[in-house]
From Swiss-Prot:
It holds the Pfam family AIM24. This is Altered inheritance of mitochondria protein 24, mitochondrial. It comes from Verticillium alfalfae (strain VaMs.102 / ATCC MYA-4576 / FGSC 10136). It is found in: Mitochondrion. The gene is AIM24. InterPro entries: AIM24 (IPR002838), AIM24_sf (IPR036983), Trp_RNA-bd_attenuator-like_dom (IPR016031). The lineage of its organism: Eukaryota, Fungi, Dikarya, Ascomycota, Pezizomycotina.
Length: 380
């Protein structure tokens, strides 16, 4: 009998080696995963996760599914009389009885959306028979992600061109601008209600889940959407240096003359000032644009894209200059001060001094007037 091969003995020895479970001492609850690219119904349920024994009125009317990655297409399955809103020029094809389908141009709040830079031309598709539509974008590096809104959590779409298609009888879309936090809400779309929404963004879309008390700082060009929670995102700027240096004002060293006052009122001086202001804004976007961020606090859910859009698509000129001019760490204090009511100072009204006038009538009928200096003198 031949002995066992040393290779077999080595393989058996490796089988007997047991790995000890490693204990996680400092586990993080922040979870980053690829966003679900399909919204198929569960076994025994519909696209909204409802059980199979629900009534006919509660059954989902549509199903979204993403085909392929990263050059993906969106497949939308519609039930009869269900309305699908998709961006104009994104419909690729229709499967089913196309004679029963109807497509109309829908204009959604053109004034408010055009002012915020949000697309307002959409195509409304409906059919009296079941229909399947294919939707795609013109960009070759765009992927899709599906948002499932069940009525309990609202979402804010941060990028202007991220919302591609949606469906749902109770799904409401409204453009939002917050004067207190215009950075996070400028050109955003608020989604509320119940339905399905498809988002498109350059690169791959990832889902980031923050636990309670956790913080995450993200560049606004990579934030596609986030869930609306009790902690709104705050503008954040990274420090360029640990030393705080103050540059003295050069104009304060020279005396104020009439020549400089007259030059400031001329059109040439104002044109040069606008040119320098635009040059500073463009340099802040191109050179120092990596210092503008958004700070999120949990619990919340973020959808982030691997390839960010331009800063000009998410921030305006005023917002870029406002963040760049503000000192690091002063934004939370400003938000706290704005939430507190201002103390109204009572205006003190000064009473006018009272005066006493004395009128005396003589025997000849003449009347003479004089002012009394003191009340005691008048009593006398």
């Amino acid at each position: 009998m031949h002995g066992q091969s040393p290779l077999i003995r080595t393989a058996r020895g490796l089988r007997t080696v047991k790995t000890r479970p490693s204990s996680c001492r400092q586990c993080r609850t922040i979870q980053i995963s690829a966003a679900p690219t399909t919204e198929t119904p569960r076994i025994g349920g519909d696209a909204f996760g409802l059980p199979a024994n629900t009534s006919v009125h509660d059954v989902a009317d549509a199903r979204f599914e993403v085909l392929g990655s990263p050059y993906s297409m969106l497949s939308v399955t519609l039930s009869p009389s269900q309305k699908l809103y998709t961006r104009r020029g994104t419909l690729v094809g229709v499967a089913g009885q196309a004679d029963n389908a109807q497509s109309t141009l829908s204009i959604l709040s053109p004034f408010s959306r055009a002012f915020l830079g949000i697309p307002f031309l959409y195509q409304r598709i409906s059919s009296s028979t079941p229909l399947t539509a294919l939707i795609s974008t013109k960009s070759p590096t765009t992927t899709f992600s599906i948002l499932h809104l069940d009525g309990t959590t609202d979402y804010m779409v941060a990028q202007r061109n991220a919302l591609l298609a949606w469906t749902g009888h109770t799904l409401l879309l409204s453009p939002r601008v917050s004067r207190g936090l215009s950075l996070a809400h400028w050109g955003s779309t608020h989604l509320s209600g119940r339905g399905l929404a498809a988002l498109s963004s350059p690169g791959q879309i990832y889902q980031l889940t923050l636990g309670d008390g956790e913080e995450f700082v993200a560049h606004p060009s990579h934030v596609v959407a986030y869930s609306v929670s009790r902690n709104p995102p705050l503008p954040f700027r990274l420090k360029s240096s640990s030393f705080r240096l103050q540059i003295p004002s050069v104009t304060g060293l020279f005396p104020e003359t009439k020549f400089f006052k007259t030059m400031r009122d001329t059109d040439t001086y104002k044109a040069i000032g606008r040119f320098l202001f635009s040059l500073r804004t463009s340099m802040r976007r191109t050179i120092w644009g990596d210092r503008l961020f958004l700070q999120f606090r949990g619990p919340t859910t973020l959808l982030m894209s691997s390839r960010g859009v331009r800063v000009a698509d998410v921030l305006t000129n005023q917002e870029v200059n406002e963040i760049s001019d503000a000192q690091a760490g002063v934004v939370p204090k400003a938000v706290e001060l704005s939430s507190q009511p201002k103390a109204v100072e009572a205006a003190s009204t000064e009473q006018a001094p009272s005066a006493i006038h004395i009128a005396s009538v003589a025997k000849d009928g003449k009347v003479s007037f004089e002012d009394a200096k003191d009340l005691k003198e008048f009593v006398r």
